[in-house]
Amino acid sequence: MQILKVRTLILVVLFAIIFYFPVYSAQRFILDSHHHAGDNQEWVQKAVKIYRENNAMCCVLTYMEDFELVKKAIKDYPDVFIGYGAVRPDDPQAPRQIEEFYKAGFSGIKYHSPQKNWDDEKYYQLYRMCEYLGLVMIFHTGVTSRSINDMPVYQSMMRMRPGYLDAIARLCPRAIIQGAHFGNPWYEEAAEVCRWSPNVFFDITGSTLHKLIKLNDLTRFQKILWWSAGEGQQTVHTLKGGPEAFEHIVFGTDEEPEGLVGNIERFQLFLEANKVPEAIREKMWGLTMARILDIDPATHKCTRPRPLPPGTKLFDASRFGK
């Protein structure tokens, strides 16, 4: 009887360990670099379940109205959620909001809907602030969605062209910059920014993969991401010491948690159509962002807690590629 009780106790303890401390093993590590916060606990629980099932984490883009919800979610489920703030760059409160996100241990800032072009000097204060605080910067690039209504909105995709990130990457060479949606429809422009900017990455969330699959044109990216890392040794027309072309793409969803699996399937089709080598695929799925955010893919733990000390170099040219 005593032996039976001991065995039962052992089983209960093992179950508790497995349930509360998920083990991530052979399944591919995925880091969703572009996931928007929900506004209730149901979203939290749904995301935890789906992302854990797929050995995935997500960078949660959070406006101030959902700040407390996401801050608690990160504390409760650090193996799933990585905090990113979201600000409107023309809002006078934007610098204060960035400071609050930073102090709370968030790792990045998302910008959307500028009233001027992304590379306008008006926004340089925000960009330099993020660089100094070690915050990843995500910029919406290209076309943006809207609904059918009669409410006037001052918003233009022309102010969010991917080419504007070129100036920001040069202005903030220690920062990590991510363009959302690969600049849809300005894909070639986005690619050329990548070619000369080792600190710039793009996700291909939104309608891009839907469009390319429907048009049977997934191989289009082979034509615009045409260079290789070694070419800089032979020609002055490609960055010397830079990453491989496809390494500039990072996985993201920009959808509800239920959309994760569908996005994984479409991204896999994209990788296969473009014959991306396996080692680079793993970086695109999550290893690149894990390196940037100091995440251990095996445990989902952050190896360098946030907030980072001011002056931290997210992109350190002297260590690049090591």
Regions found by a protein language model. Name each.
Residues 29-35, 46-68, 81-86, 107-111:
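Divalent metal-dependent hydrolysis catalytic cores, especially in the metallo-beta-lactamase
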Residues 10-20:
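Bacterial N-terminal signal peptides
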Residues 21-25:
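Sec/Tat signal peptide C-region and signal peptidase I cleavage site
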Residues 33-37, 62-63, 85-89, 110-115, ...:
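A cross-domain feature marking catalytic cores of carbohydrate-active enzymes
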Residues 38-41, 65-68, 90-93, 117-118, ...:
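Active-site environment of divalent metal-dependent phosphoester hydrolases
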Residues 108, 123-250:
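Catalytic pocket-lining loop regions of alpha/beta-barrel enzymes
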Residues 4, 8, 27-33, 42-57, ...:
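Mid-to-C-terminal alpha-helical segments outside catalytic/metal-binding sites
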Residues 65-159:
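Active-site gating/metal-coordination segments in enzymes
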